[in-house]
Amino acid sequence: VKKIVIIGGGTFSPIRNHLSLCAPAFGKTARQLGDMFNDKLIGTPEDKEYKVEVHLTKMADPTSDLVTNDDIEDLLAKLLGDKSVRTIVMNCALCDFDAAIDDRGFHGDRLKTVEGEFNLKLRPADKLISMIRNVRPDIFLVGFKTTTNASEEEQFLTGLKMMKSSKCNLVLANDTVTRRNIIITPEEVAYKSSIIEDNMYKGGHFRVVGEALQKQEREDQLKELVEMTLARHDLTYTKTKFVRDDSIDFYDAPKTFKDVMRFVIGKGGFIENNGNGFTPGHFGYKVADGIFVSSQRKVNHNDVEKNGMTLVKVRGDSVTAVGSHKPSVGARSQALLFEKYPQYDCIVSGFIV
C-alpha cells in the first residue's frame, strides 16, 4: 500500500515553563484535505492502492504527541525511512523562529511579571520542508505559503521562491487579507479560481466579496490541489547522472531550430517574471535515437546563444547529461516526445503572449 501523508496543525517553540512562541494553526485544512483525498480515491483503481494518513500536532489534536518543530522533524525522519510513503502534503505551520531569553532555556527559572520587561531573542529555525526531497527525491511534495495583503504578483513570486528552495512539486499560496488562493506549479504557472474576481464587479460598481464566496473559493482551490496531486503524484522519477563539461554551442543546432528559437525569443516567449533571473519553458533538438540537446536549468533562456545547451543521453531508465548546467526539468518530457514521435526532431515550449 502506498501512503499519502498529510501533516497539519501548528507548533510551539518553548521559551520557559508555561510560555512558548507558536505558529497558530488548528488543523482544519489538513482535515479537509484528508477527506477530499479519500473522497476522490473512492471507487477508483487507486482506492485499494493508496492509504491516506493525517498527522495533526497537539495544537490541532489534544491527543497528539507532536508539539515542537523537533517533533515534526522526528516524524519526517520516520516517514522518509518508510518506502511506502509516496506523497507528503506539508500543511503544518512550523514556528519560523526558535525563541530564547537567555542560555538557560525552557528549564530555566520561571519568569515573573513583577520582574518587569524581558528581551526575547529570535533565531531563524531550520526549514524542515527542505529536507524532504533532499532525502527522498522520489516523494511528491505539496507545500503551502502564506502572504499578507500582497499583490497577486508578489504572492506568486513568494510562493514560487518557496517552491524552488524546497523542491516542492506543488505549492498553494494563500493571502490572509485578500483571501486569494493560488496553486503554483514547477513550470511556473499559477492556477486560481475566478470566483472572487467575477463577483467583485457587479452592476457597474465594485462590491465587497462576502465570507461565503471566500470560503467557496478556498474549498474550490483545495479540491483543485487534490486533483492535481492525484494526477501528478504517480509520475515516475528518473535520476540524471550529470557530467560537468563545456556547453553545446547554440550555433551547432539545426538551422530550423535556431530560426524558431530566435522567433520565439523575439516575441517574448521566455518571460523573466519569477524574481530569480531564470525563465520558464524548455527546448531541445534530437541528434540521434536517445540522444538530444536540451535547454539548461536555472538560466535565462533569452541568453541561449551566449550560454549554450546541454547534451542528454537516454538509455532505458539511465539518463546522462553533459554540459555546464543540468538540463531543463522539461528534458524528460522531451525524451518521451522524441521517442513517441520519431518524425519530429525539434521541441520548443515557451509562453507566447
Regions found by a protein language model. Give the residues of each.
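Short, well-ordered loop/turn elements at secondary-structure boundaries
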Residues: 1, 279, 287-288, 341-344
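A cross-family phosphate/adenosyl-ligand binding-site feature
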Residues: 1-227
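Active-site metal-binding loops of divalent metal-dependent hydrolases
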Residues: 10-11, 297-298, 352
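Conserved active-site beta-strand-loop modules that form the wall/rim of enzyme catalytic pockets
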Residues: 23, 290-293, 344-348
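Short, conserved, surface-exposed binding loops centered on an aromatic residue
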Residues: 81-82, 131-135, 162, 284, ...
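Short, high-confidence coil segments that cap the C-terminus of an alpha-helix
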Residues: 84-85, 168, 230-236, 344
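Long, non-catalytic terminal segments
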Residues: 219-329
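Short HxH-centered metal-ligating active-site micro-motif
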Residues: 314-353
